[in-house]
């Protein structure tokens, strides 16, 4: 009996919402009418969980159906209660708490007095979505991999070997696609990004040379024919002019004789203009038209520091700057054309006591070049060629010892 009193037995009813104007949709405004009883939001939440939710279309309209049957008297009153719940009065605001408590106790007593007939409980309908599983291959996560599908489809080891052969064949083509048979292969096109082959270049060069040779021979034959015609015409003119004995005729004959001289030379008589011949003959042809000091300057642009033994700087006959005209000083872009004057060693010595006044036109960085051969060998105990072969730091050390740095 206590269990029945704790569990409120309600008849099927409807849930309506009387929304307050101030707070629309608040939980306190949701009420339910069951057997002429008005239940609030908290009592709706206290309904046992074994009640089945049949249809949820709106959050404020829920229909509850109990698991037990009702008596004949309750079935007679059922349409009336539903009419009351669907009437416009059902949307009226909830009554006071006193009226609601009295009506609730009366309903509980009436439900307890009626005999309860137990019925078979019905399973509740699920209120969540189940995906369709009509087709077995609809779930992609349960499918085997593609290569296993092919194995299951083929089944035989021959199909497996065929697939492997296809994979190997497709790997030979770019992007695993065979080339279009209508288009030429990439290697057969004219475009080739790499340097040309020497064999191909040589064959093309021979073809061009043969074609040029044939064209030159044809031109020479035409020139020979035209020259013969011109000679014949001039001979006729000479014969006609030789008949004229006046001075005017002699002058015209002289002019024709001058014109008959070979003016142009054929291409075969010209020198070969290959890079090898040009490099060999260009130096002699250019230097022959220049004066002697110009030839020396242009032909010898290396310094005496890098010159081999036996150069002009070390020979006694080319002293006084004769052999040093063509020397190109380190750091200067132009060769030193002016003569290097020779001074005695005492005039070139630099002392630490005071700044020594050097002679005008002296290279302060290379004072040893203004020494004579005898003074150079006496100061440095070596020839200028040997001094030039030394390292820079070694030369500077020797010049410091000799007070020339």
UniProtKB/Swiss-Prot annotation:
Domain called HP: residue spans: 337-405
Modified residues (Phosphothreonine): 114
InterPro entries: AbLIM_anchor (IPR032402), Actin-binding_LIM (IPR051618), Villin_headpiece (IPR003128), Villin_headpiece_dom_sf (IPR036886)
SUPFAM superfamilies (UniProt xref): VHP, Villin headpiece domain
Phosphoserine modifications at: 16, 18, 26, 92, 96, 110, 113, 156, 226, 269, 279, 289, 303, 315, 333, 372, 383, 403
Record's compositionally biased regions (Low complexity): 11-29, 113-124, 277-292
Domain of life: Eukaryota
Region of interest (Interaction with RASGRF2), residue spans: 224-308
Post-translational modification: Phosphorylated. Phosphorylation at Ser-403 by PKA causes the C-terminal headpiece domain to associate with the N-terminal core domain, and leads to the inhibition of its actin bundling activity.
Acidic residues biased stretches: 216-228
Any one cellular-component term (Gene Ontology): postsynaptic density
Skewed-composition ranges (Polar residues): 294-322
Domain observations: Both the N-terminal core domain and the C-terminal headpiece domain are sufficient for binding to F-actin and necessary for actin bundling activity.
Name of the protein this chain belongs to: Dematin
Organism, scientific name: Mus musculus (Mouse)
Gene from which the chain derives: Dmtn
